[in-house]
């Protein structure tokens, strides 16, 4: 028996990252982790910086880094509108480690709520990139 699927589009301001049939996706919404399967109730939510893990029609997996965005689930399909989206294989580990180091230093030297919030957001993005790199390496 064939797996149930739905149509997924992952797009950013720069490009269309993925379009096709999937069994499920996993993404971090504003209220926590979301697993979207065929027949999911309609939903509109903000996406936190992190990753979208895609299980394609025939079971292959792909991981894409998202800097944030919007997730829309409708009966006709699912759309991920990302601010920035980068395939795991295209991320630069050295740059991500350097971004993480700079954000940690910025947090230590922050002198106010705004500085701390900005540095914390940058740290979250760097950690998310490193996690996507790690998962992409494991899949290879």
Curated annotation (Swiss-Prot):
Q: How does it assemble?
A: F-type ATPases have 2 components, CF(1) - the catalytic core - and CF(0) - the membrane proton channel. CF(1) has five subunits: alpha(3), beta(3), gamma(1), delta(1), epsilon(1). CF(0) has three main subunits: a, b and c.
Q: Which GO terms describe its molecular function?
A: ATP binding; proton-transporting ATP synthase activity, rotational mechanism
Q: Where in the cell is it found?
A: Cell inner membrane
Major site of localization recorded for this protein: membrane
Q: Write the protein's name.
A: ATP synthase epsilon chain
* Cellular component terms (Gene Ontology): plasma membrane; proton-transporting ATP synthase complex
Keyword field: ATP synthesis, Cell inner membrane, Cell membrane, CF(1), Hydrogen ion transport, Ion transport, Membrane, Transport
Biological source species: Photorhabdus laumondii subsp. laumondii (strain DSM 15139 / CIP 105565 / TT01) (Photorhabdus luminescens subsp. laumondii)
Domain of life (superkingdom): Bacteria
The UniProt entry's sequence similarity note says:
Belongs to the ATPase epsilon chain family.
What role does this protein play? Produces ATP from ADP in the presence of a proton gradient across the membrane.
